[in-house]
Amino acid sequence: MALSIKHPEADRLARELAARTGETLTEAVVMALRERLARTVGRTQVVPLREELAAIRRRCAALPVLDDRTAESILGYDDRGLPS
């Protein structure tokens, strides 16, 4: 299977890494990918999910209040929790 990356910086970085390590271009890319994958092992969706939820909280907190009534009042319940 062939991998064709047409990105000048990717090419430059791969060549620089290969030159520093004495590896072929393919070896340098494979090793870099293996090392990156090894660093991500054990990571779960917790970190991205936490960041996503924090962003949602920030967006919700920034929303204007359009109705000053309490949630119970909006839903139609009285102070005893019964429909009013």
Curated annotation (Swiss-Prot):
Instruction: Tell what triggers its expression.
Output: Expression is low but constitutive, and repressed by VapB-VapC. Member of the vapB-vapC operon.
What keywords appear on the UniProt entry? DNA-binding, Repressor, Toxin-antitoxin system, Transcription, Transcription regulation
Q: Where is the signal peptide?
A: none
Knockout phenotype, as recorded, reads: The vapB-vapC operon is not essential; cells grow faster than wild-type on rich and minimal glycerol-containing medium. The operon deletion mutants die faster than wild-type under potassium-limiting conditions, which is prevented by overexpression of vapB. The vapB antitoxin gene can be disrupted without causing death, however despite elevated vapC transcription, no VapC protein could be detected, suggesting that RNA processing and translational coupling are important in VapC expression.
GO MF annotations in UniProt: DNA binding
| Pfam families linked to this entry | PSK_trans_fac
Q: How does it assemble?
A: Forms a complex with cognate toxin VapC.
Q: What does the UniProt record say this protein does?
A: Antitoxin component of a type II toxin-antitoxin (TA) system. Upon overexpression neutralizes the effect of overexpressed cognate toxin VapC. Overexpression alone prevents cells from entering a nonculturable dormant state, probably as it binds endogenous VapC. The TA system acts as a post-transcriptional regulator of carbon metabolism; in M.smegmatis 3 TA systems (VapB-VapC, MazE-MazF and Phd-Doc) may be involved in monitoring the nutritional supply and physiological state of the cell, linking catabolic with anabolic reactions. Translation of vapC mRNA requires VapB.
Name by which UniProt lists this protein: Antitoxin VapB
Tell me the organism. Mycolicibacterium smegmatis (strain ATCC 700084 / mc(2)155) (Mycobacterium smegmatis)
